[in-house]
Amino acid sequence: MPIEIPTDLTPELVPLSWLIGEWEGRGRLGSGDEDSEHFVQRVSFTHNGLPYLQYRAETWLSDDAGEKLRPLTVETGFWALERKLEEGDGGPGLIPADIVPVLKTADEVEERRNKEGGFDISVSIAHPGGITELYYGQIKGPQIQLSTDMVMRGSHSKEYTAATRIFGLVDGNLLWRWDVAASGKALEAHASAFLHKVS
């Protein structure tokens, strides 16, 4: 499946452009063994002309045939190249960015490539229950690796201390795995899924 890059995409999102669109599919909780519960998921990555992707994932528990049983959770966030913000960038709050993006050309984006040949990225994801994750990691072609730098929890949130996520594009499909450290345990398999692009 060819990757189409939107003509209005800001240059620094080109490394992330293969994520843009809506994805649907099925997954398993835990390690994915025969006792692991099933889920279905719909994920969207959208852009609005600013230098980040907006992310939303909605997940339902399902039977083993993929029929939805009940809502499981929703998470939402932002994905961007990790770089020092400059005067032309927007924020904080409603302070507008310059109309011309800070990184204006493909060459300026290429200069941000790291020693491993990929690009450093940051991802923030908010969850119900007062939990927000801040991930740092790398995108290298169709592969993404993320590790939490910080997990912020509300005063009544369940214990959750760290996570890693990996994403990959394989034969036009989005595969991901999420490991978490929660409830006093070390990092362990939390969920994984296989999603196909629907738009």
Curated annotation (Swiss-Prot):
Its cofactor is heme b. It catalyses: peroxynitrite = nitrate. Keywords: Heme, Iron, Isomerase, Metal-binding. Pathway: Nitrogen metabolism. Binds 1 heme b group per subunit, that coordinates a highly solvent-exposed Fe(III) atom. It is an enzyme of class 5 (isomerase). The keyword Iron applies. A motif (GXWXGXG) lies at residues 21-27. GO terms for molecular function: heme binding; metal ion binding; peroxynitrite isomerase activity. Its EC number is 5.99.-.-. Forms a 10-stranded antiparallel beta-barrel structure able to accommodate a hydrophobic ligand in its interior. In fact, this fold hosts the heme group, which is located in a wide surface cleft. HAMAP family: nitrobindin (MF_01297). Belongs to the nitrobindin family. Heme-binding protein able to scavenge peroxynitrite and to protect free L-tyrosine against peroxynitrite-mediated nitration, by acting as a peroxynitrite isomerase that converts peroxynitrite to nitrate. Therefore, this protein likely plays a role in peroxynitrite sensing and in the detoxification of reactive nitrogen and oxygen species (RNS and ROS, respectively). Is able to bind nitric oxide (NO) in vitro, but may act as a sensor of peroxynitrite levels in vivo. Homodimer. This is Peroxynitrite isomerase. It comes from Paenarthrobacter aurescens (strain TC1).
